[in-house]
Amino acid sequence: MSNGQLVSQVTVGHDKPLDREKVCPMLLRVFVANNRHNPMSEYNSRNGGSVPPSELQMHTWMDCSLRELTSLIKEVNPDARRKGTTFDFAIVQADRGSPRYILRDVGNTTNGERGIDDNKTLQQCKFEVGDFVDVAISLPSQGRRFNNREQGDRFDHRQRQRSPIR
């Protein structure tokens, strides 16, 4: 990343198209949290396999893109529909060497913007049946406001019109 370009952590290959009419969908367990990923301590393979409380269950296919998952999350989460909201996706998978889970970042999408991760599929992210998807939803930051107005009050507006510096 020395030349200032954005580089994705997951390489996008070209997979064969999946016929959704013939292939049975799988159950995808998605866990969302605001401004952060769920703590790994909430994913516990002991004690009956506890998981975070904010679970969404979706039936989808391995060729489902991160943009499609974003749309499905927005259907059930009205706050996430705002332009500029960022969805940071990670896969939570069992660590094969121990009885715990590990979190692996796979990409992010933003409402109202196109991104390099939009068309990544679960298959390209190396998702396996039995894994979870953890999504950190970050609402756009609120700009400086005056009396609930983006541009300030009437006085501020008049001052900007008269100012020689624009």
Swiss-Prot record:
Region (Disordered): 143-166
GO CC term, one of those recorded: nucleus
Cystine pairings recorded for this chain: none
GO molecular function: transcription corepressor activity
GO terms under biological process: negative regulation of DNA-templated transcription
Basic and acidic residues composition-biased segments: 147-158
UniProt KW Cell membrane keyword: no
InterPro entries: SAP18, SAP18_sf
Keywords: Repressor, Transcription, Transcription regulation
Family of the protein in this entry: Belongs to the SAP18 family.
Known partners and oligomeric status: Interacts with SIN3 and histone deacetylase.
Cited function: Acts in transcription repression. Involved in the tethering of the SIN3 complex to core histone proteins.
Record protein name field: Probable histone deacetylase complex subunit SAP18
Organism lineage: Eukaryota, Metazoa, Ecdysozoa, Nematoda, Chromadorea
